[in-house]
């Protein structure tokens, strides 16, 4: 039995995205969102990778927000398995760096949007993703910087307001 959320989560775990390195996670997610019709904008700042992806033109905006970075592994010999090799235990638990915080949540958000848009190709509102590789570190060049930029744009256009935000942590 295949599970789209598990498969995407495993793909993200395999990427050694130790803060602030994204290790290509945003490229993986961005490619899937682009296939759905999202408009992608990279808003990188220094060594931090940020992605702002939007779908739809009118109506209230629901934003999915999260991060691709993980904290450093520490002493690798203290691990019972490679932290960047996803492993499903005999009890069905997924192990790997980012499995709980928060690569599985990102995968669930992406797959939920895929299913939603498959059944609702023209929703009555807008969808967005605000993703960063700067949450586990200083957390100043990620979400904070993107929200500040979006606020500036909103002051000029009024069209980028986030009405609702879902954070999967």
Which residues does each predicted region cover?
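Acidic/His- and Gly-rich active-site-bordering loop/insert found
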Residues: 1-99, 117-124
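Acidic/histidine-rich catalytic neighborhood of metal-dependent amide-processing enzymes
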Residues: 102-169
């Amino acid at each position: 039995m295949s599970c789209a959320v598990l498969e995407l989560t495993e793909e993200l775990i395999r990427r050694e995205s130790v803060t602030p390195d994204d290790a290509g996670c945003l490229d993986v997610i961005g490619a899937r969102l682009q296939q759905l019709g999202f408009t992608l904008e990279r808003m990188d700042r220094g060594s931090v990778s940020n992605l702002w992806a939007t779908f739809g033109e009118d109506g209230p905006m629901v934003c999915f927000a999260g991060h691709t970075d993980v904290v450093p592994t520490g002493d690798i010999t203290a691990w019972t398995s490679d932290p960047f090799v996803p492993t499903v235990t005999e009890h069905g638990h997924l192990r790997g760096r980012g499995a709980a915080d928060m690569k599985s949540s990102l995968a669930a958000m992406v797959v939920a949007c895929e299913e939603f848009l498959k059944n609702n190709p023209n929703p009555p509102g807008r969808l967005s993703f605000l993703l960063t590789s700067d949450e586990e570190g200083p957390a100043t060049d990620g979400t904070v910087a993107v929200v500040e930029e979006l606020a500036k744009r909103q002051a000029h256009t009024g069209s980028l307001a986030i009405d609702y935000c879902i954070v999967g942590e």
